[in-house]
Amino acid sequence: MNILKSLISLSLITFISRILGFMRDLLIAYSFGASGITDAFFLAFKIPNLFRRIFAEGAFSQVFIPILSEYKNNKNIELTRNFISNILGLMIIILSLFTAFGIYFANDIVKICAPGFINSHEKLYLATKMLKIMFPYIFFVSLGSLTGSILNAWNYFSVPAYSSIFLNLSMIMFISFVTAYFNPKILSLAWAVIVGGVFQILYQFPYLKNINMLIFPKFNILNLGVLKFLKQIGIVALGMSVNQVSIIIATISSSFLISGSISWIYYSDRLVEFISGIFGVSLSTILLPLLSKSVNNINIKEYSRLLNWALRLVCILVIPSIIILFTLSESLITLLFKYGAFTYNDVIMTKNVIEFYSIGLLPFVLIKILLAGFYSIRNVKTPMKISIFILVLTQLMNIFFIKYFQYTSFALAISLASWINFFLLYRKLCQSEFFIPSTNWLRFLLKIFAAAMVMLILLFINKNLILSANTHSIFFKILRLFYICASSGGGYLFTLFCLGLRFNHFYLKSYKY
């Protein structure tokens, strides 16, 4: 398998999905702005997404894929099918109970996550109503994660990536054509989430049938694979939930601040997740099955080679992205969201959050790579312990910063904590018997730093010359931003080329650790 080709393909699909996500957010911003009702929607939307990141994209896939990889490589097909069938049965039971619990206690969950809403009847009512509608999304997206993990184990990386497009398409269609039939109109978004969740899982069924893995559920908790899964899932879920608890605490704080705070944080998250999704999620998705295979084959050299390759590739790609995001944040937000009810004040408020998030964007992505390294060697306790420490540290910093930075305090706190998180994880992984760190990191980083400085100079020159011209044409705005990014990015790549870095160095077959 050509890993770099798979990564480019997966990143391109993720890019398309994120662009559709921006179109979705543009329509939301145009239709509803950044107000109390959008705060209610984004809170209600955030809660199932927090649990999705814990159960679906987080703990589940990190534990399930290494065990499935072991079955696929070392067991026969019937044992593998039986393991998947029992995991499916277990998930359906747990998710059904959890969904029923969430719907029944929706009002209490909203009050816990956003106590500031208690004083606003409209916000509380809308958030509760929309949460009841959207909570089943956890059920569908978690089952979609199961099917996606199976397909990833068979190297069908692009199929699960395409499934995320359905949520964005559903919301775009509902905003464009169905909103008028709802009162209040924003309720249409909640139903769009459910429709998108259903299509996310149905779309993958034909591909499961192609690999003979479209299986009916069973329930045997004594299955050896299931027992191994249950032994690890609790620890990983705890570690994954720590980050989400941190976000919930930040949401609680934001609910007491000026109206629109939750919305500004949401829109800034979208831009940050655009970069982390294209590079971090795509790379870790491909990396985890490959690392698990190298561990199952007791191939430490290949394991180290994969991790070192991924870490260096992240640095090459993410550092220039951070520079662009930080330097052009106001222009990007204006282009993406400043329409209709979304005002210039909303642009500035969102920009302030993005600038603090940019500080921690590189470790955000690097941590995803390191976690794949830990989970592939079945070390789930170390990331969990570190994440608990980081949770406490983040909240202490947030308490200190909120007095000075208000709604941007959490972005600053989590960015600084992410650097500490990265260094702790990297140090622990270097101490393991599996990972041999790459040499010449300092020389490599100095080359990137030099290229980044050239890029930054070009960005400022182009920004002052080109962005000073006022225009109301969206096409011209897109064109000039594309030119600024392309010319500055070209300078970055040319500098790296002059310093001796070549694209073919990152073909994995020729990469040396």
Curated annotation (Swiss-Prot):
InterPro entries xref list: Lipid_II_flippase_MurJ/MviN, MurJ
Organism (species): Buchnera aphidicola subsp. Baizongia pistaciae (strain Bp)
Name recorded for this polypeptide: Probable lipid II flippase MurJ
Top-level taxon in the UniProt lineage: Bacteria
PANTHER family xrefs: LIPID II FLIPPASE MURJ
A cellular-component GO term for this protein: plasma membrane
Gene symbol of the encoding locus: murJ
MF GO annotations: lipid-linked peptidoglycan transporter activity
Topological relation to the membrane, as annotated: Multi-pass membrane protein
Pathway annotation: Cell wall biogenesis; peptidoglycan biosynthesis
